Amino acid sequence: MQSAFDALEKDTVSPNTSSPSERAFPSILINTAGYVSLSDMEITPPEETMKHLTTNIFGPMLCSQAFARLYFSASKAAESSTSPPPPGRIVSISSQAAHAALHQHGAYCASKAGLIGLTRSMASEWGPKGITSNSVSPTVAWTALGQKAWGETSVREAFLKNIPTGKFALPEEVADSVVFLCQVCAF
């Protein structure tokens, strides 16, 4: 089962779990929604901080809750089956900004650190029930979002000096980490 939806719209991430046996067993959720807007902390409008928190924490929380409800419902329905349900996997994309202080990144750093806290709580609560929860914290990935934040040449070159490899991550490099965490051997 594969789907895309607006992570901030509760109604779009609350699937009907009345008959899970009619659908494929849910096994993987990747929380990829992200938002960044750079500004000095003393002038960051409260609305910008809320947009960071809403997109980077609340959205993944809504999606993860919906996934867990669907997984647990399908798992219960599969109890009478001879084969055990596949393990559930939740992988959230955080950021190295959750681990390091970055200029003009106050709201972003806080939101990505919060996502790691959420992920740890999900791992603690849902791990014993069959769902692992992990986060990946890449450096800047050269996506549309990364280009928006770091597209200016002088800013980009200054930041690259602080990255040991001297380059931003490619989306496929981040994806490789996510794929590994979704494999059975990562349980």
Task: Give residue ranges: language-model regions.
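C-terminal substrate-recognition "lid" of short-chain dehydrogenase/reductases
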Residues: K167-F187
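Residue(s) in the substrate-gating loop at a strand-loop-helix junction
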Residues: S95
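Conserved NAD(P)H cofactor-binding loop of Rossmann-fold oxidoreductase domains
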Residues: T32-S37
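Active-site loop immediately N-terminal to the catalytic Tyr-X3-Lys motif
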Residues: M41-E42, A100-G106, P128, G166
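Alpha-helical segment proximal to the catalytic Tyr-Lys
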Residues: R69, S124-E125
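Active-site helix of classical SDR
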Residues: S64, S111, T119
